[in-house]
């Protein structure tokens, strides 16, 4: 019987994955869920306490707590890694810190189980902006604006990916990077259809601009069922129907990220005199 682990089930992505698994669970599935607040999870999903299929095991703890992670990852063949920080500020490291703790925990489990250890496949939410074969489909101005505003969040994810790749080389895990476009309609339950995009070809299939969280969650679940097709690779997810677009929310994230970049610039340049700052900023 398979065991899945879900890290971060109260955010938009984790909630979408959980809704999909509850609606159509794989046969005989055990689902370990790691959350900071069990109360918050049950408020969103009150039926979890009586759900029979899949069998639910809720672990309350921080995503960097190796004891909680060991309970969550024990016997898991697939782990959905949805822990992230929406704030793109200098020094953000939640994703990388969580992955570091995951790798440490898997090392403990391999030492505990020895030759019986089975390396799980970690499905990591990433972004099409970090996938050259998908980002090349985006107008350069849009790509540059997004990359500027989400710079620190992207750095956090890139560092996390470096940890995955080093751990995979040691046989601790396999990974799959899940690369959506802009994601909309957080916590909306309605799916309109999705398709996976293989990034093996030199030229990928077209990725639509907007994808709903509900369809992203379904994409994650499909990738888990087809993990052998995508091991240690990125895979795109695109919409096949019309997603409910919530550009105002995304604009807010970009604006906050731009403020984070400006704040970091100001902190770095503050010791200098104002005239020097102005000259450097203008390229003089």
Swiss-Prot record:
Database matches in InterPro entries: NAD(P)-bd_dom_sf (IPR036291), Polyketide_Oxido-like (IPR051606)
Broad class of enzyme this protein falls into: oxidoreductase
Enzyme Commission (EC) number: 1.-.-.-
Record keywords, A-Z: Glycoprotein, Oxidoreductase, Signal
Top-rank lineage group of the source organism: Eukaryota
Gene induction: Expression is positively regulated by the dothistromin-specific transcription factor aflR. Dothistromin biosynthetic proteins are co-regulated, showing a high level of expression at ealy exponential phase with a subsequent decline in older cultures.
Segment forming the signal sequence: 1-23
Disulfide bonds: none
Residues the record marks as carrying a glycan: 62, 86, 190
Keyword flag Nucleus: no
One GO MF term attached to the UniProt entry: oxidoreductase activity, acting on the CH-NH group of donors, NAD or NADP as acceptor
Functional pathway: Mycotoxin biosynthesis
Membership in a protein family: Belongs to the avfA family.
Physiological role: Averufin oxidase A; part of the fragmented gene cluster that mediates the biosynthesis of dothistromin (DOTH), a polyketide toxin very similar in structure to the aflatoxin precursor, versicolorin B. The first step of the pathway is the conversion of acetate to norsolorinic acid (NOR) and requires the fatty acid synthase subunits hexA and hexB, as well as the polyketide synthase pksA. PksA combines a hexanoyl starter unit and 7 malonyl-CoA extender units to synthesize the precursor NOR.
Protein name (record): Averufin oxidase A
Species this chain originates from: Dothistroma septosporum (strain NZE10 / CBS 128990) (Red band needle blight fungus)
């Amino acid at each position: 019987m398979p065991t899945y682990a879900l890290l971060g089930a109260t955010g938009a992505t984790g909630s979408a994955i959980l809704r999909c698994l509850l609606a159509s669970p794989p046969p005989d599935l055990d689902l370990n869920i790691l959350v900071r607040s069990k109360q918050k999870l049950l408020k969103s999903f009150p039926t979890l306490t009586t759900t029979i299929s899949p069998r639910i095991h809720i672990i309350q703890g921080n995503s960097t707590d190796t004891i909680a992670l060991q309970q969550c990852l024990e016997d898991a063949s697939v782990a959905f890694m949805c822990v992230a920080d929406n704030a793109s500020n200098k020094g953000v490291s939640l994703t990388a810190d969580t992955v570091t703790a995951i790798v440490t925990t898997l090392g403990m489990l391999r030492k505990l189980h020895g030759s019986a250890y089975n390396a799980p496949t970690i499905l990591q939410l990433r972004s099409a902006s970090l996938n050259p074969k998908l980002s090349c489909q985006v107008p350069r101005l849009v790509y540059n604006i997004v990359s500027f505003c989400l710079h620190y969040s992207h750095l956090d994810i890139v560092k996390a990916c470096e940890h995955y790749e080093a751990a995979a080389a040691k046989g601790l895990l396999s990974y799959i990077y899940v690369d959506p476009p802009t994601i909309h309609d957080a916590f909306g339950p309605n799916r309109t259809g999705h398709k996976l995009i293989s990034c093996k070809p030199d030229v990928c299939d077209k990725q639509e601009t907007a994808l709903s969280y509900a369809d992203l969650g379904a994409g994650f679940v499909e990738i888990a069922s087809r993990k052998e097709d995508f091991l240690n690779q990125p895979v795109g997810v695109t919409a096949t129907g019309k997603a409910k677009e919530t550009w105002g929310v995304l604009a807010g994230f970009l604006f906050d990220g731009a403020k984070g970049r400006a704040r970091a610039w100001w902190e770095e340049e503050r010791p200098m005199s104002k005239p020097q700052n102005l000259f450097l900023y203008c390229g003089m």
